[in-house]
From Swiss-Prot:
PANTHER family: RIBOSOME MATURATION FACTOR RIMM (PTHR33692:SF1). Belongs to the RimM family. It is found in: Cytoplasm. GO terms for molecular function: ribosome binding. InterPro entries: PRC-brl_dom, PRC_barrel-like_sf, RimM, RimM_N, RimM_N_sf, Transl_B-barrel_sf. Residues 94-165 form the PRC barrel domain. The keyword Chaperone applies. This is Ribosome maturation factor RimM. SUPFAM superfamilies: PRC-barrel domain (SSF50346), Translation proteins (SSF50447). Pfam families: PRC, RimM. Keywords: Chaperone, Cytoplasm, Ribosome biogenesis, rRNA processing. Binds ribosomal protein uS19. The PRC barrel domain binds ribosomal protein uS19.
Length: 165
């Protein structure tokens, strides 16, 4: 059994597709089909077997999943999370991070004072957006770029942004 610390979320089943038990898979890998090159597991560490049927214009994958053969079975998988083992992932270049490693990191201002944390990292197709939860419990969304986040480390993130009063 694997702890969630040893797993990286690489995809989620969005919905069923058609009547043969196919599922629509949102892959978090780049390119999306890279997910198929990994040993995939669920939260409990059980192996998952996925076979690509096709890819739509949004980059979502239409796949067969384990032994699912009917639409009814596939409908029960909506929201199902797919992981791979952290140890199986390639070494990252400098200034590259896995989303799982950035989520919940403290955010510091230019004076290195903690002002919040990364709540989530989102992508709606035009680039990564960082959702910040500030110390006063308010949240804001900012694009993930060097202008707003000039320094990102494995331990903290520096934010170059003045909030409106």
């Amino acid at each position: 059994m694997n702890s969630l610390e040893n797993l990286i979320l690489v995809g989620v089943i969005k919905s069923c597709h058609g009547i043969k038990g196919h599922v629509m898979l949102k892959s978090f890998t780049d390119p999306a089909t890279k997910i198929l090159e990994r040993n995939l597991v669920n939260e409990s560490g059980a192996n998952i077997h996925i076979k690509l049927i096709s890819q739509n214009a949004k980059g979502e994958l239409i796949c067969t999943f384990n032994d699912i053969a009917t639409r009814n079975e596939a409908e029960n998988l909506k929201g199902y999370k797919i992981f791979c083992l952290r140890a199986s992932l390639p070494e990252l270049e400098e200034d590259e991070f896995y989303i799982a490693d950035l989520t919940h990191l403290p955010i510091l201002n230019q004076d290195h004072k903690e002002i919040g944390k990364i709540k989530n990292i989102l992508n709606f197709g035009a680039g990564d957006i960082i959702e910040i939860e500030f110390s006063d419990q308010t949240t804001e969304l900012l694009p993930c770029n060097k202008e707003f986040f000039p320094i990102i480390t494995k331990d903290y993130v520096i934010l170059n942004y003045q909030r409106e009063a």
